[in-house]
């Protein structure tokens, strides 16, 4: 085993990386409220795991979406638990993100030189809200359908380009299969990818600049 470790150590300098991680200074003023961002990340990872599990059974078509969700809840092994955890962690992620934003704002964590960290955090907040909007529609029940119809209809109030934006979001003039396909793609691929990228940027900047000082 030591030879295997030495082989990787010679090429990747694992010990140097470990020393850098474990030797990072944590300011004495840090308390439990500084963990809210990490809890949000944990909720996101739970979302990825449970969401991936549900893709084995979910069918993103207007005729089969609702039935596939029912199958997950009643027939698939532990499907009810996986979907429930997905829903609960989604609510928890939104709550923790809001509390994290308040903590950062109240402690002045957005000030120089951490402006870009704040900007990436705001982008992550928008992405989190987008997860909620797109995920809400996927069961394609009455609530999901009308929620999509209302949300995608909002841009119509924009002068000149409003109708084009609505058609872009829906995939056609009305809500239907194209809309569900778009929202499913956004929810399962585009948004997770963007979230992972901005989280990496967010945590890299925190790692570089350190935790902000007390108020």
From Swiss-Prot:
The keyword Iron applies. Binds 2 heme b groups non-covalently with two histidine residues as axial ligands. Binds one heme group covalently by a single cysteine link with no axial amino acid ligand. This heme was named heme ci. InterPro entries: Cyt_b/b6_N, Cyt_B6_PetB, Cytb/b6-like_sf, Cytochrome_b_N_euk/bac, Di-haem_cyt_TM. Heme c binds at residue 35. It is found in: Plastid, Chloroplast thylakoid membrane. The chain crosses the membrane at residues 32-52, 90-110, 116-136, 186-206. Component of the cytochrome b6-f complex, which mediates electron transfer between photosystem II (PSII) and photosystem I (PSI), cyclic electron flow around PSI, and state transitions. This is Cytochrome b6. It comes from Lotus japonicus (Lotus corniculatus var. japonicus). The lineage of its organism: Eukaryota, Viridiplantae, Streptophyta, Embryophyta, Tracheophyta. The gene is petB.
